[in-house]
């Protein structure tokens, strides 16, 4: 284990206004802004590529697979670049957001340019590849600093819970707005044909709204914890520190299970209500649960964290969610109403962890500094983001494989009639996957994740003392945070 003092850096808490509602609301707008880009691309880019630009599903699939691989490594690279960048007067992370939001939003608009459909296929493919890859890289350049910034806004465990909760609210709001509003504007005529021109202008509006949200984040939040570095931490030493941080390794494994569950469950729910229950209205209700549970749980997250701890609350919630899905698996109900009720409670169990996941990451960042003496917000966040993208790629491939394995019949005519055996297998997958994933995540938290309530509080106290020791005062009596930094 390393010493808790490192000569190459100095971390302090600057003199600034106390953590307040401005920080919470400002941080929330950051993820609303992210979803004006990320959710628009995730939800609508494929249909734009296939129905407007005329690309085949195979061409789009190969593009997404290559880009996802590049994106995952971009997260780690950007995290390291951010950590080693100059400290500005507004902090280390906000300048990155301020600069990189512009190329991100420009590339977002370029993704949906309709005139590309008139170009030759090879030119179309090159343009699509360059713009999608560019969008992914610049999204990392905004999202990694944004996510890392939470640990720099406050070191107080309760404040971190608030930031995580407001970020989850922002994500839910941003996803809901883009998912349910955009389809109202992109179709024309009685046949509801997709309009490439309308698509383009809707995305331009989303880019403008995303810019406004990012600006609110930049101007409303304050980076209070700042690290001044005189030298870069060697990569070998950085990797060693990552492996010493057991909390990071375990959180990565837990996050992989949660993300796989989210992606596979979302896919299977669509097939379940389409083929097993044959109820499209119920499908819409089920898909809303992802947003609704976050909003319902948000008012209670801080109380539960203060009373029991982040780890402790999440273990109970995940086990509760797993139990609800397990009951559905065993009962094998044909009642849509009963399924929706149990699904709602199961979603509450998974939703509590999703509310707190960003606070878990800030706990891990603080733990990394306590263990190694080195504060690496960006790279720690980037490693976790890398794991989430790998999990998304696994879920994407595994979902298609499972449908083929159980004998699901595809169709070009609106949907083939599935056999009784196949639809019951769909039910088993829709309930069995979350039962297993949530149970494994809960057990990893219970037996291997070291940051319980007591440890988190102790780490916060140690870092507060260390940062106070590091505070350098000029002869005039001004605090280190008042000295001139890079503009």
Question: Where are each of the predicted segments found?
Answer:
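Membrane-embedded alpha-helical bundles of multi-pass transporters/translocases
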Residues: 2-487
């Amino acid at each position: 284990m390393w010493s808790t003092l490192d000569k190459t850096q100095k971390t302090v808490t600057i003199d600034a206004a106390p953590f307040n509602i401005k920080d919470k609301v400002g941080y929330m707008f950051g993820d609303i802004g992210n979803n004006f880009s990320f959710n628009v691309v995730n939800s609508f880019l494929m249909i734009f590529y296939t129905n407007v630009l005329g690309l085949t599903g195979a061409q789009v699939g190969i593009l997404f697979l290559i880009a996802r691989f590049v994106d995952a490594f971009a997260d780690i690279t950007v995290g390291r670049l951010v950590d080693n960048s100059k400290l500005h007067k507004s902090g280390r992370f906000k300048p990155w957001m301020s600069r990189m939001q512009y190329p991100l939003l420009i590339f977002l608009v370029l993704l949906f340019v309709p005139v590309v459909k008139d170009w030759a296929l090879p030119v179309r493919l090159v343009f699509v590849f360059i713009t999608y890859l560019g969008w992914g890289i610049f999204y990392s350049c905004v999202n990694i600093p944004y996510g890392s910034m939470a640990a720099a806004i406050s070191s107080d465990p309760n404040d971190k819970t608030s930031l995580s909760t407001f970020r989850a609210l922002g994500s839910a709001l941003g996803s809901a707005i883009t998912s349910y509003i955009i389809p109202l504007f992109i179709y024309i005529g009685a046949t509801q044909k997709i309009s490439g021109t309308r698509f383009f202008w809707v995305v331009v509006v989303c880019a403008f709204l995303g810019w406004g949200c990012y600006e609110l984040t930049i101007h409303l939040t304050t980076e209070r914890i700042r690290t001044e570095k005189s030298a870069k931490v060697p990569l070998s030493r950085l990797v060693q520190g990552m492996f010493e941080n057991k909390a990071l390794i375990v959180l990565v494994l837990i996050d992989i299970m949660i993300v796989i569950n989210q992606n596979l469950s979302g896919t299977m729910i669509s097939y379940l209500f389409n083929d097993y229950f044959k109820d499209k209205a119920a499908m819409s209700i089920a898909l809303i649960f992802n947003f609704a549970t976050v909003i319902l749980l948000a008012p209670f997250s801080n109380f539960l964290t203060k009373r029991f701890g982040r780890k402790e609350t999440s273990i109970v919630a995940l086990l509760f969610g797993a139990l609800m899905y397990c009951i559905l698996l065993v009962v094998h109900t044909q009642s849509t109403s009963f399924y929706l009720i149990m699904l709602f409670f199961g979603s509450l169990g998974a939703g509590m962890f999703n509310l707190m996941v960003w606070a878990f990451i800030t706990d891990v960042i603080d733990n990394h500094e306590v263990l190694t003496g080195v504060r690496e917000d960006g790279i720690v966040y980037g490693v976790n983001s890398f794991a989430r993208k790998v999990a998304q790629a696994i879920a994407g491939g595994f979902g298609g494989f499972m449908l083929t394995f159980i004998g699901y019949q595809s169709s070009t005519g609106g949907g083939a009639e599935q056999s009784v055996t196949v639809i019951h297998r769909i039910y088993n997958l829709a309930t069995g996957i979350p039962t297993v994933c949530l149970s494994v995540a809960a057990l990893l938290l219970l037996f291997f994740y070291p940051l319980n309530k007591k440890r988190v509080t102790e780490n916060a106290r140690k870092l507060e003392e260390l940062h106070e020791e590091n505070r350098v005062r000029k002869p005039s009596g001004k605090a280190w945070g008042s000295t001139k930094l890079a503009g």
